[in-house]
Design a protein with these regions (language model features):
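Residues lining hydrophobic/aromatic ligand-binding pockets adjacent to catalytic sites
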Residues: 1-177
Length: 177
């Protein structure tokens, strides 16, 4: 089965972060932060992170087209998300830009062991969870790195529906046959 990992850098030291990546044999980190910087944790700024990863023998790619910080559309069908940031990202997932980004990610992940990375440690509080839904529906096993020994398999969002081959997150009772 095709496998892809997710990880959040959180407040870890760069050494702790690299240790997690090595424990799961990650060969490439795909940064899915819209803005690849961190004021609170400067070790995860794009330049510093890329340098540390390169020194550890791990490739780095920034994929802004999979980044979060999206705003919901006025005609959003993803009303199941009360969190407007998640609703906005769910709306964005139906765009050609997202689909292209997802394909680029999949192309990388068939060649190397890849982890998508954002800042939030808890994947269910990050847009990585929605990206993981899209990948899981495409037949990928997505594992969320928690510790050196633990990577939790992704479970699809409970209110996810597939309508006309698109992932949607309708409010309860919407789009029911």
């Amino acid at each position: 089965m095709k496998t892809l990992y997710t990880i959040g850098h959180s407040t870890r030291t760069i050494e702790e972060f690299l240790e997690l990546l090595k424990a799961h044999h990650i060969q490439e980190v795909v940064d899915v932060r819209t803005v690849p910087q961190s004021r609170r944790n400067p070790q995860f700024g794009q330049d510093q992170l890329q340098t540390a990863l390169t020194q550890a023998g791990i490739a780095y790619t920034h994929q802004k087209n999979l980044g979060g910080l999206r705003h919901p559309s006025s005609d959003s069908i993803n009303l199941g998300w009360q969190n407007l940031a998640f609703r906005g990202y769910a709306d964005y997932m139906s765009t050609p830009e997202f689909q292209q980004g997802l394909q680029e990610l999949e192309d990388r992940a068939v060649k190397k062991t890849v982890a998508i990375m954002c800042a939030e440690a808890l994947w269910w509080r990050c847009h990585r969870s929605l990206t993981a839904d899209a990948l899981t529906v495409q037949g990928w096993q997505v594992l969320h790195i928690q510790s050196r020994k633990t990577a939790k398999p992704h479970e699809l969002t409970s209110f996810l529906k597939i309508i006309d081959d698109k992932l949607t997150y309708p409010a309860t009772g919407e789009y029911e046959p």
